[in-house]
Amino acid sequence: MDSPILRKAPIQILKENGIDYLYHITHKKNLKSILRFGLLSRNLCIEKGLAVEEIGDTEIKERRGMTMLPYSGLRLNDYVPLYFNPRNAMMYKVCKRFNANNLVVLAYDLMVILISGTIFTDANAASVDANFYYRKSELEKFDWKIIQSKDWSFGGITFREIKQKMMAEVLVKERIPRKYLKKLICNSLESVEDIKSLVKGKVEIEVSEGMFFY
């Protein structure tokens, strides 16, 4: 466990690499539950009988459900996943599948990384490329230039390493309390209108067309 004296250092590492928030992509239909209960892991949602509009690929969800994390004794689906860079291959897939108008990106305070038991990966946690890190100080080892890349394809060639590293994750055990949610990001004013009555001014809503794919 990192020394409490060093607790601010990991957040500084993120800020110095252009990361102001941690992100989770979800369907707008899930907002009501998230605003009420916080953001829950897939397994905790199942345990509590919460209806969830799933956006992830079934095969990948099953793989994450079987992936046991080193040392913790828990599986990936026992954790809530957040991205450092939300405009990644996962975002591309779900935008093509559901249309960006139906999606919302949740932006969380960086203080989330201080929640006990939080784990970090330097690539998509379900991929064979991922390394798992249990100390916040190890964020210094991450290749932030690649993680913060704008694209994973150049000249028609897809670079697998870049694609996977852009999906590096923060894994929070079971639940992220509502207090850490700082803003909701939609792709259009039309989408904002869809969720305004639900949010009731309790969370900032922002429009960012460039975060989504079309």
Task: Please place each PLM-identified region on the residue numbering.
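Active-site-proximal loop/hinge segments that shape catalytic or ion-binding/gating pockets
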Residues: 1-81, 87-214
